[in-house]
Structure formats: C-alpha cells, structure tokens
Amino acid sequence: MKLAIIAGDGIGPEVTAEAVKVLDAVVPGVQKTSYDLGARRFHATGEVLPDSVVAELRNHDAILLGAIGDPSVPSGVLERGLLLRLRFELDHHINLRPARLYPGVASPLSGNPGIDFVVVREGTEGPYTGNGGAIRVGTPNEVATEVSVNTAFGVRRVVADAFERARRRRKHLTLVHKTNVLTFAGGLWLRTVDEVGECYPDVEVAYQHVDAATIHMITDPGRFDVIVTDNLFGDIITDLAAAVCGGIGLAASGNIDATRANPSMFEPVHGSAPDIAGQGIADPTAAIMSVALLLSHLGEHDAAARVDRAVEAHLATRGSERLATSDVGERIAAAL
C-alpha cells in the first residue's frame, strides 16, 4: 500500500501522527510519503498545490489528510487552491460521511437514540463548480448568480454507489433533495434514483425534501440507512449528522473516486484549530476513524473493522477523562 500524507496546518500534524500510529499497528509496512502542503508552504514559496505534486499524488493508493487552514492566509486561498483543486483534479465525485452514535458518546438528542447511517454526497457538481458571476457589483442594481450544475453522468455514478452501499447495509436508501422547487435538477435526481433502483429490487427507496430530512435527523434519525444527495444539501446535512452523533470532533470523511482511477482522500471533518495547535490536547479520534474508512476503501475490511472496534472500545470507556493527543492514539493502537 502506498499512502500519501498531507498533515497540513494547525492540529493536523498532531492528529495525523496518531492516525498513522494506528495504521502502522494494524497494517505494518505501509509505504508512506509526506507532503508539505498548507500555510507553511504558501508563506515560504507562494505555492499552494504545484502540478508536480498533483502528479506524484496520483501514484499513491490513497491520501490521508490532517487539516487545512490558517488565519495567516487569506480566506479561501488554501480551501480553493488545495482542497477544491484536489477534489476536481482527482475526481473525488463522492463525499462519504458516516454518522454513527458510538456507545459512551453523548448526543444532544434526548435518550441517545440509535444512529447509524451514511451520507453519500455528490462532490464535484451542484453550485460549487464556480459557474456564476456578478454584474453592477457594489451598486443598488447588483446581480449575482450561482448556477447549480447537475449532469446525468455525475448524478448516476453517485446514485449507483449509494445503492451499492445500501445493499451491503440495511437495504434502505433515501434521496434527499427539493424537487418541489428545484424541478429541473430535482427531476434529474429523482428519475435517476428510479432508474438505477430497478437494478436493486432488494433496496427500499424513500424520498424526503431536505427540510423534512433535517427534522427527521433530529426527531427520528434511526429511519435513515443510506442518504444520497447533491453537493449543497449534502454539505449542510452532513454537519447536522455529525452534531447529533457527538460533534465534528468525532466525524470522519472520505473523498472518493469510485472508479479508482485516482487515489481517494480521507480526513477528519474538524478544522485546523490553530488556537490549540502544539499543545498536545487535540482529539485524534476522527483522524483515526478516517484510517478505518481508508482501509475499507482499499479492501482491507478486517483491518478496518479492527480499527473501528478499537475506537468503539475507547469511546465507550473514556467518559469525561481528558487525554493527551498521543495517549488517545496509544490507547486505540493498543486495543487492536
């Protein structure tokens, strides 16, 4: 296995070190290459993501990312120049966000309900393609547009992936959109789910408007198994899903090229948290969860399950104990 590591900014290097510690414990001998990308490189060279680095990243099986972002860099420079560019260059058309409430983790929802679903979010289309513009900027007559781009090809490949995941899970898929208002894009998504669903007669299909889905995520999260949705709605509901499962500090994600032509990238959802960087108190659990996603994607299902069980055991027993970053990694690695 060839792994590219982008530790990034803030607490990124700290949590990534613990994730790699767990990876080495469960799958020894991984060939690792670290890339210095983020604020430090930007300040030193003016570069964000050189073409040569993109070419090198393509030669790896997967990418492990820590966190990107620093207040010393103008907002959007690293996000667009690094994260979004990687997404489009490597065709990460699926953003995978598991949502599970682990034993021992408190949910803001009363009764700590059973929560275990996954959101399959389209990652390269929708309103995030940069298709828009503005005229008469700064005047009372300013007009600004953002065009949501949805292609039959792009929608179908994400929907097909979601059905495959539903078949391997509890065989239930929910399309989340807003078809009553976004009739053109919504119609494409709805028709595609109906068409692809014909090949999956064992998977039950449901539809919810995005506003209703946010309500049910709070009042009845157990109804969801696999959610498939577009880029914008997915961006919003995945953070809500993380919140009801204990917060983004326990949320992992995968940015996936389902064709496997390019390496997929796995990362904790949390940010770089520069205010606590270097103090050794950042929680690396989400980064370690990202390792489980990475291993599963690469077909190392037994190793992925071992990491997940070790994380579950750690969360079930740590309670309110405050642990150093390295202590968390060592505990989880020892439980493998």
From Swiss-Prot:
It catalyses: (2R,3S)-3-isopropylmalate + NAD(+) = 4-methyl-2-oxopentanoate + CO2 + NADH. It is an enzyme of class 1 (oxidoreductase). It is found in: Cytoplasm. InterPro entries: ICDH/IPMDH, IsoCit/isopropylmalate_DH_CS, IsoPropMal-DH-like_dom, LeuB_actb. Gene3D superfamilies: Isopropylmalate Dehydrogenase. Binds 1 Mg(2+) or Mn(2+) ion per subunit. Substrate binds at residues 87, 97, 121, 211. Pathway: Amino-acid biosynthesis; L-leucine biosynthesis; L-leucine from 3-methyl-2-oxobutanoate: step 3/4. GO terms for cellular component: cytoplasm. The record marks 128, 178 as: Important for catalysis. Its main location: cytoplasm. Keywords: Amino-acid biosynthesis, Branched-chain amino acid biosynthesis, Cytoplasm, Leucine biosynthesis, Magnesium, Manganese, Metal-binding, NAD, Oxidoreductase. NAD(+) binds at residues 271-283. Mg(2+) binds at residues 211, 235, 239. Its EC number is 1.1.1.85. Its cofactor is Mg(2+); Mn(2+). Catalyzes the oxidation of 3-carboxy-2-hydroxy-4-methylpentanoate (3-isopropylmalate) to 3-carboxy-4-methyl-2-oxopentanoate. The product decarboxylates to 4-methyl-2 oxopentanoate. Belongs to the isocitrate and isopropylmalate dehydrogenases family. LeuB type 2 subfamily. HAMAP family: LeuB_type2. This is 3-isopropylmalate dehydrogenase. It comes from Mycobacterium tuberculosis (strain ATCC 25618 / H37Rv). The gene is leuB.
